[in-house]
Amino acid sequence: MNNKQGKVWVILMIILVIIVSCFLAGYLYIKSKFDKMTQKPLDESDLGIEVQEPEREEIKKTNVDNLIKFVIFGSDSRDTENAYAGRSDTIIIVVINNVQKSINLISIPRDTYVNVPGYGMTKINHAYAYGQEQLSIKTINSNFGLDITQYMTIDFSGLVNSIDRVGGVEVTLDQDEVNFINARVSAENKIASAGLVNLNGTQALVHSRNRYVGNDFTRASRQRAILISLLNKIAKKDVNEILSLSDEVLVNITTNMDINKYKDMFIEVAGDRQEYLKNINSVQIPSTEYGYDSMIEGIYYFGFDMNRAKEDFNKYYYGI
């Protein structure tokens, strides 16, 4: 398994480890784990946060003490063979809502056509290459009217094999997906038939990178489905197994999050973890329902209706 095939899957697994660790151990445990991460601050005065329409401003005031919000970036900077090298291959916004007792995972397609401040209209993942987390968050906020200030960025080296430690994940595959995996794995990792299959790490990594059966949006849908399935599987694992896994992966995260700000919220999440597990929402914004393929000077972009995208963010980000 090469590094390119594993990267998107690893970033999803990182989300799982952080959230499930929170459920199982609460604030003190999470605090000790966050201390293992590399801290890299941002200039919060230059993140593209603007005064929003009254409805959003009111909900922001109401939810200020009830939301944990951050964005996760997966960078391909170490993959010299990847056309997306140096850009954010994956962008996932995580919103933990203590009022609704829910977890929203919002993925933004990397080809989304937006205005990158200082660079003009281009793909949203180019912002990471131009200005790393600072410009990436500014781009997201300024285009969609959000107020993200916190992030996690994944260093993929040494993480790809960690998925096997949780025993894989059950997913339903059609025959085309089985054929795709089998063409890219060794004999011992080939899948016998379509249907419900428990994928090991190698198989899952290939499956998560598959954009040839369907398209890039189908791939994102696969990733989100795997994420939810794996979350429920990890939640049933022995606590010591999860602690050991988190020790291995969290040291590979760079962040600016201050866990002390969320002490009370993490304690509440830990106490009601079963409710949160019942309310995991995984969506793509902009959606393919109002997005469209666009070719500009021979380059593919994902265009979309901005008003409808903001409506979706009202629901899944602001909770309106």
Explain the meaning of each model-derived region.
Residues 8-100, 282:
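Entry/capping segment at the start of metal-dependent catalytic domains
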Residues 79-82, 122-130, 145-150, 209-218, ...:
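Second-shell loop/turn segments in exported
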Residues 120, 132-140, 155-162, 201-204, ...:
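Stable alpha-helical elements in mature extracytoplasmic
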Residues 44-60, 66-68, 85, 116, ...:
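C-terminal solvent-exposed extensions
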Residues 127-188:
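Amphipathic, coiled-coil-like alpha-helical scaffolding segments used for oligomerization/assembly
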Residues 1-9:
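N-terminal Lys/Arg-rich, disordered targeting/topogenic segments
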